[in-house]
Amino acid sequence: MAESSAATQSPSVSSSSSGAEPSALGGGGGSPGACPALGAKSCGSSCADSFVSSSSSQPVSIFSTSQAGLSSLCSDEPPSKSMTSSFLSSSEIHNPDPTTPLGEKSETLGSQFVLAKGKDPLVLLDKKKLDSPQGTNKDRVDAPVSLATGIPCSHPSIPDSFPEQPAFLSKEIGPAEEWVVKDQEPKNPNKVPDGEDRSALDFGQSKAEHICTYSLSPSELPVASVEKDSPESPFEVIIDKATFDREFKDLYKENPNDLGGWAAHGDRESPADLLEMNDKLFPLRNKEAGRYPSSVLLGRQFSHTTAALEEVSRCVNDMHNFTNEILTWDLDPQAKQQANKTSCTTESTGLDRSELRSEIPVINLKTNPQQKMPVCSFNGSTPITKSTGDWTEAFTEGKPVRDYLSSTKEAGGNGVPGSSQLHSELPGSMPEKWVSGSGAATVEVTLPNLRGAWPNSVMGEVTEVDSSGESDDTVIEDITEKPDSLPSAAAKTSEREIKETPSRETVRSEMCENSEQPQAQPETPTQKSLEGEVASQVPNTLNEVTPEKLDMTNNPKVCSAAPPSVLNETGFSLTVPASAKLESLLGKYVEDTDGSSPEDLMAVLTGAEEKGIVDKEEGDVLEAVLEKIADFKNTLPVELLHESELSGSETKNIKSKYSEDSRETTGGAPTMSPDLEQEQLTIRAIKELGERQAEKVQDEGISSGGKLKQTFAPQSGPQSSSDILEHTDVKTGSDLGIPKNPTIIKNTRIDSISSLTKTEMVNKNVLARLLSDFPVHDLIFWRDVKKTGFVFGTTLIMLLSLAAFSVISVVSYLILALLSVTISFRVYKSVIQAVQKSEEGHPFKAYLDVDITLSSEAFHNYMNAAMVHVNKALKLIIRLFLVEDLVDSLKLAVFMWLMTYVGAVFNGITLLILAELLVFSVPIVYEKYKTQIDHYVGIARDQTKSIVEKIQAKLPGIAKKKAE
């Protein structure tokens, strides 16, 4: 497409560009940029547009001879955005008047083409082909055109470095013809290239190798476009469809494969119907196909006149009608017929596979089951299609698909042809691209209607894919690590299916060496919805065939005695990754069978179990599975106990909260019930843990809030590990063939952990917190000398003050001292802020904002702790004063009699001072002289005991009472 300097990016008609310098296409017949590598037949089927113009405003006939050119009009975009590149052949631009002066400008789509005076255009064309070097287009002016939103378009380059020179737009397209208005002057004859020129054009096209891929968006469309009824436009569109049908009907029948496979119906349908069918199939092609058919890339530019807009409107309406009809068609026979045609496609194109790489893969329904096409969903109501907006995202970076082709080769060239890999090499700009390595064929297939078709098509292959154990590269991911990237069954391909494909398609077998290996795609919401329904219809089959995957495909439903919130908090699941050894075992059982039904696979597994095909590797795998589940259960939080304890009103038996009634698991894959021995070990382990916990709570006074999490962790090895869950979901050796029964969770009552009441637990909790907050032990043993000295000095001064003054005086002086300090500091800060003119605010703002409110729960805790001691004191006083025990009451009497003498010598404050001195001195002295002190204390104790025995011997009443 030629462009003027006034409207460089404009593919529209411009009548104000007469002052621009002429420009023409660079690179003649052999130029790589002259024509995309689309094949001789493909280019032959897409003839160029012809625009004949002169200095005067004469009517010009504009008619597209490219079938795919009009197909762009039937896309979902408005007509203003749906424009194609106009490829003009040098044989179409003529200057019939030999007297035309050099420099006279001829307007064609906003570009001036200067014709040589007195020269034959075809002679100049041949001369230009021979003189122009190949691959030397340095000055390129690539005008972006829009086929649909973001569709890559290939067009020739335009050098703009030939001012004031005769130039000709050339393009190797095959039979380029010119259409002229009937009432035009006879001086504008029609010229058609003869056989020599056509063969030269075909020979030149075989050298074209460079393909420029553009990522286009609506923002790149030019603004300078002619309005619908612009009076300034010198062009008039006259569409002669009858002549078009008469001239090109044979051409459609010659090239059925280049038109995307829909031309197979050419014998019984008119070219207009074929054109409409191609228009409907083209916009609905999915993004995985890589590129679009070669014939679609050749089009023309429209002048946006009334006739063209009416044609566009008609095509768009027909497209919508056809889209509604195609969803109800049964295209299964058509898909098979198109798959059989692929064997002769490459030969008909005449391309050299060693030089040209096709960027349009051959789509096969058998090997690409997850290919997203315009199909009906499973409920038959919602069509699943790919919009053209997604194509824009795939090409936003503007990178040629050939670059991705090389990365695909590196990723998939080393594996087995049937292996399935995660395609991590593809960048984010092409999330769902499937690229084929070689060949130039394009076969458009439509996924058959999946409604009620489980025995065939994709459903049958899903079962084969997951159940065959032959794919060594199958990626198995953990649910907890990547919950959104699970490999679905529909994204895997069986090796057996790939091996069947080359036998049916000989051409693809040659291309299979480099790039036929499919790559696993990232999931999209549409694909997830498809795969979710597929997986929901085959939950039992997939999990029975691969028993080592514990509910990997379906949503895992963990049957446990613990509440569901625990599993949600911890993020763990009973998902055990498949072992390579177990996969190899399954592979040995399945590799001889070629059946596609799950019943055949289950029969093979059952037969293998009956024959006793169990060896050492199986035992090792089972041990690994057991250890995996044991590790998982060891990590279960035991904070469940505390949560259920708080939820109950009174908990005398903490563990009894976790014994649940018998129930059977529903949904998900069936699992094996644990062995009787394993159940006994589980119950025994839980009982031992409960008894041990009760002893620890009673001896150490551990609170139920924080310590239970650590002490209740299982410590009895892998067999009895954890089995806090009331059952064990462990796969044993009999899983391979024996039919599975649902797991039954038995009601198990566990002994009480502790006989302590809730009040006692709270009391111990408060005391433990007080001891931890105030390290009295470290304080009285002088671990921190500064801290101990400060506390000891302050308390001693206060006690001495109380000894010298009254309590009221001491309290008053203390309050006055504190207020003097705070008020002085407050005034000082206010003066400093006034002098410095700063706004630091209140100096005690941080302390004022401290929340010291006592909650009702904390108050109740403290009161409960205090009431325990008050109740004990009241009970003791009643026992002593009511003489429940005479000896105890006598002891109290003797003690009080001795205290009368002490009170006569010392008052209460003096006793407190003495007590403080003893508290801060005796522990440290005892720590230093522990051995000697213990020796002398032992001697004193023995002497005291002997004296008491002598006294009791002399008092017979007391002796009898003690004997009783």
Curated annotation (Swiss-Prot):
The modification Phosphothreonine is found at residue 593. Gene3D superfamilies: 1.20.5.2480. The modification Phosphoserine is found at residues 31, 217, 225, 230, 233, 270, 303, 429, 529, 596-597, 673. Residues 776-964 form the Reticulon domain. Residues 1-32, 68-109, 179-200, 479-536, 645-674, 697-723 are annotated as: Disordered. Residues 919-964 are annotated as: Interaction with FADD. Isoform 1, isoform 3, isoform 4 and isoform 5 are expressed in spinal cord. Isoform 1 is present in brain, where it is expressed in the neurons of cerebral cortex, hippocampus, hypothalamus and cerebellum (at protein level). Residues 2-795, 820-876, 900-903, 927-964 are cytoplasmic. GO terms for cellular component: endoplasmic reticulum; endoplasmic reticulum membrane; Golgi apparatus; Golgi membrane; synapse. Homodimer. Interacts with RTN4. Isoform 3 interacts with BACE1, BACE2, BCL2 and FADD. Interacts with ATL1 and ATL2. Isoform 3 interacts with TMEM33. Interacts with ZFYVE27 and with KIF5A in a ZFYVE27-dependent manner. Interacts with RIGI. Interacts with TRIM25. This is Reticulon-3. It comes from Mus musculus (Mouse). The lineage of its organism: Eukaryota, Metazoa, Chordata, Craniata, Vertebrata. The gene is Rtn3.
